[in-house]
Regions:
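Short catalytic micro-motifs in class I SAM-dependent methyltransferases
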Residues: 1-5
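Non-membrane alpha-helical structural segments and their capping/turn regions in soluble enzymes
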Residues: 6, 10, 123-126
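Conserved catalytic/acceptor-binding region of the Class I
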Residues: 10-11, 17-94
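Hydrophobic alpha-helical core bundles mediating ligand binding, dimerization, or RNAP-core interactions
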Residues: 40-47, 71-74, 78, 104-107, ...
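Core SAM-dependent methyltransferase catalytic element
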Residues: 81-83, 104-107, 146-164
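C-terminal helical/coil "lid" or tail adjacent to the Rossmann-like core of SAM-dependent
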Residues: 86-140
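C-terminal alpha-helical interaction module
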Residues: 134-135, 141-142, 146-151
């Protein structure tokens, strides 16, 4: 998910294009569609609502370039820069199954918002996540689904120039 944090993004992508060798491949994992993974939005909302109770302005500024967070805007940007390369986006949903307690702790780490909390508030958040996972568990196990997109850029020509 490193590409998600890059800002400014355009110089990063242009540098990647410049150093990409003939038949070379650049790949990145970026955010997926929030609605494509069962339960993801609920977990997202639990975490962000909790953090915003403590830090009301949290989320007003995003980390990285916001164009990476939307497949439509990222696709447009990548096609503009890598116009003479093969570009593919593949959606994925990563699934994790574990006991509610373990899953609550592990899942919180996928969200930067949880990292701004004090130890005391973090434990309260984990407790809220555990309660959510307790309600959705089957045979003692709960599931967390994480949406992601895999970007793959392949340089298919000997000259993959920077300027069009």
């Amino acid at each position: 998910w490193a590409l998600t944090l890059m800002d400014p993004l355009v110089p990063v992508l242009k540098t990647i294009k410049r150093i990409l060798k003939n038949k070379g491949v650049f790949s990145a994992i970026v955010d997926g569609d929030l609605h494509s993974a069962t339960g993801y939005l609920e977990i997202h909302n639990i975490i962000y609502k909790f953090v915003q109770k403590i830090f009301p302005n949290y989320g007003l500024l995003e980390l990285g370039d916001p164009r990476v967070r939307s497949l439509k805007t990222l696709d447009k940007l990548v096609k503009k820069i890598f116009y003479d390369c093969e570009i593919n986006f593949t959606p994925h949903v990563l699934s994790f199954k574990q006991t509610p307690e373990v899953l609550a702790r592990e899942v919180s780490g996928f969200f930067y918002a949880s990292l701004v909390l004090s130890s005391k508030h973090y434990e309260i958040l984990v407790s809220e996540l555990k309660d959510y996972f307790d309600k959705t568990s089957v045979d003692g196990l709960s599931e967390f689904n994480l949406p992601a997109n895999r970007l793959v850029v392949k340089k298919i020509s000997k000259v993959c120039s920077l300027e069009k």
